[in-house]
């Protein structure tokens, strides 16, 4: 029987990336070291990494027909990512972002044109055949709709034997109040450093202890804190930590968080422990920071 897939639900966007030797001053005219088009978006990037790691994966997100979508779909296919779940929209434009990557320190500055393209709805998600997937990862966006999607998975899982249940993870990256209802869903919840700092926490460990009461019974909460590494807190109350694995030189951090999330999911889906998954996530994300793009992370 064919191995089940990992489905990532969220954003795909065209990233137009300018690599510069130093961040430009306002109102100046300068050359970049290189420029490339790259498929971006959190869930989309996580699919790229999962595929590079050897997982069978699929992407679900919104696209509008046109040249940009053609490029993005071709790139998904080149990476071996299944795009049969894409929600094609009759209105709106495919989103695009301009990214400045500073080659001297790896910083990335993103200016997103988040267009009028509708997000994937609970109605779109009703068409998904849940029997095809062993894991579904949801990037927090239109949370009220995503709660309905997560409830559908919960209802499905309630009818399945343990080995047939779909495992679920959720990412809460943006400090938007609407997204915080997603803490209560999924067996793995990724909360970003940005959200943790927005809520007044000064370290990953402090954030996990302060936010753990929001997750559902038995879930694990994970927080990556850039060069400080990452922490996880599960139902046993033991705080796990992995140091970061910085490359010899940081050149591109665009998508590092998505790389971490995907690597943790991949490791857990293979039956590894949370400590092993946390370490693996930090290792692969660290390697990515030393490379332009994603090629070469494995």
From Swiss-Prot:
Beta-D-fructose binds at residues 15, 41-42, 45, 258. Pathway: Carbohydrate metabolism; fructose metabolism. GO terms for molecular function: ATP binding; fructose binding; identical protein binding; ketohexokinase activity; protein homodimerization activity. GO terms for cellular component: cytoplasm; cytosol; nucleus. The keyword Kinase applies. InterPro entries: Ketohexokinase-related (IPR052562), KHK (IPR034093), PfkB_dom (IPR011611), Ribokinase-like (IPR029056). The keyword ATP-binding applies. It holds the Pfam family PfkB. Its EC number is 2.7.1.3. One of its GO terms (biological process) is response to fructose. Coiled coil: none annotated. Homodimer. PANTHER family: KETOHEXOKINASE, PHOSPHOTRANSFERASE SYSTEM TRANSPORT PROTEIN. Catalyzes the phosphorylation of the ketose sugar fructose to fructose-1-phosphate. This is Ketohexokinase. The gene is Khk.
